[in-house]
Amino acid sequence: MSDFTPTEMMTIAAARALTNDDVCFVGIGAPSAACNVARLTHAPDITLIYESGTVGTKPDVLPLSIGDGELCDTALFTVAVPEMFRYWLQGGHITTGFLGGAQIDRFANLNTTVVGPYDHPKVRLPGGGGAPEIASNCGQIFITMALSKRGFVEKLPFITSMGHGEGGNHRERLGMKTKGPTRVITDLCILEPDSVTKELTVVSIHKGVTREQISENCGWAIKFADEVIETPTPTDTELSVLRDINARTKKAHEAA
């Protein structure tokens, strides 16, 4: 089972970033797939929390939304949304938040609000939901997005969820005590913020991908770390788990 798609590589690389001890606030879509692959492989005791208030959920299929009944059915317990945000999130009980977005800039700020001017946008996006609070209050943030010039842009038209702001110690100057984004996992590479400037820097390149491909698909002059490794390819077990849960999800949603 050596063949895999760029999306599978991205999902599995994201799953590997999680540990067995994490308490993770999970976003819908790619973050949900990554978190559940981690739970079904190397991190069986990870605690997955969704915005709707489900704690310790272990879904057999991936949810379509935070209100999917599968999340409540398999949760250890469910709390009200105000408690979820005030006690769990703002109370500092969540180690890792997993987010995606429509657009991201070099300092890992995210836009899920509008493309184009706010008053007259070309596209109006779904909005932030709980993402701004997640980005501010989780111990650290992982982001999953496909690398493209459309998504990785020089300047965001709107900042929905703050990453590292203008770079440097911007979060600290605003009184934010959490780390913010520590890793961005894409279908071509993995990026981490520079320790000083906080600009996203390529630290790992997926097998078969070139530096030229990465540069061509980014909206700014992307930087590479002094030492860049090759991302380990997915194992047969990782691919099997991911494909099985995707197949179950497709079947369940087609039958619904």
What label would you give each PLM region?
Residues 45-54, 72-76, 122-126, 205, ...:
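Short, Lys/Arg-enriched charge-dense amphipathic segments
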Residues 62-225, 230-237:
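Conserved phosphate- and dinucleotide-binding cores of soluble alpha/beta proteins
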Residues 9, 21-25, 223-233, 256:
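Flexible, glycine/charged-enriched surface loops at secondary-structure junctions
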Residues 18, 22, 38, 42, ...:
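Structural signal for hydrophobic packing residues in well-ordered secondary-structure cores
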Residues 227-256:
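Acidic/aromatic/glycine-rich contiguous surface patches that form carbohydrate-binding/processing clefts
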Residues 5-6, 80, 119, 254-256:
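Alpha-helix capping and helix-coil boundary motifs
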Residues 1-75:
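N-terminal active-site beta-alpha-beta segment that forms phosphate/nucleotide-binding
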